[in-house]
């Protein structure tokens, strides 16, 4: 995997911009397939997967925060809250007569959009408070639980409708980019489908977090170690897939696409 910068919010802001579509034609896709972006993203996902092989890290479902950074502990708390509450609060419409895609998924996805900014702000706040400010590389369980609780709260509380969104400050640019990846990670609210493109968006989201230093306090010239990546691959990915299984099963989302992610 290529070397990943550590950095903090201000460093990332200088690199961030709202994602924009560039692939429209077959030649565009051919260009992407030979690009540094495709190479780095594929390397990141491959390295993340291989981190679980012959690792000293032992994933314990009863203690999933072990080995995570504060920012990722916040993300885990948000994903866990989404998994345990949203489907129960927004059950599928049993009277809907559809072959694929229960219309209640639109309400689920609208909630994701509504609360995604709070979720990302919680991630960044925990990172700044415990990584950037304290310059630590290991955190005790009380710190990780505090961040997980903050992440959970961000997913459970309705967003402030009057709060400004989509601003143009450096911090806003970071949040806007991360938000675009996150809301595309859980299916399409109009097509009512879910596929490899949505899964890929979640790994782009993780990749972006890695690029801005959210995986931990590591030197800018050092790629994340296996011990750092294994908890992410097992704890974060497990929680993400649990949500995706839930929305596919309960809302009966249509399989998206037929050619893979690219």
Identify the residue ranges that each predicted region occupies.
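N-terminal leader regions that mediate targeting or early regulatory function
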Residues: 1-184, 189-194, 198-199, 230, ...
């Amino acid at each position: 995997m290529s070397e990943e910068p550590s950095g903090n919010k201000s460093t990332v802001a200088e690199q961030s911009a709202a994602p924009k579509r560039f692939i429209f034609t077959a030649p565009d896709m051919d260009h992407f397939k030979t690009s540094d972006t495709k190479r780095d993203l594929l390397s990141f996902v491959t390295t993340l997967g291989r981190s679980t092989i012959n690792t000293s890290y032992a994933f314990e479902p009863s203690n999933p925060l072990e080995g995570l950074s504060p920012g990722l502990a916040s993300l885990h708390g948000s994903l866990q809250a989404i998994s345990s509450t949203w489907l129960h609060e927004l059950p599928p419409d049993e009277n809907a007569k559809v072959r694929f895609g229960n219309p209640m998924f639109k309400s689920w996805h609208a909630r994701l959009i509504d609360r995604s900014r709070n979720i990302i702000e919680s991630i960044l706040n925990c990172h700044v408070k415990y990584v950037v400010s304290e310059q630590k590389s290991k955190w005790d369980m009380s710190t990780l639980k505090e961040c997980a609780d903050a992440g959970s709260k961000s997913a459970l509380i309705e967003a402030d409708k009057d709060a400004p969104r989509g601003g143009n400050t450096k911090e806003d640019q970071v949040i806007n980019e991360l938000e675009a990846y996150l809301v595309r990670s859980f299916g399409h609210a109009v097509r009512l489908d879910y596929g490899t493109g949505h899964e890929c968006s979640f790994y782009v989201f993780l990749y972006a977090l890695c690029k801005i230093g959210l995986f931990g306090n590591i030197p800018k010239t050092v790629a994340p170690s296996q011990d750092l990546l294994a908890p992410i691959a097992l704890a974060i990915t497990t929680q993400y897939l649990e949500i995706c299984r839930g929305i596919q099963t309960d809302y009966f989302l249509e399989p998206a696409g037929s050619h893979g992610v690219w």
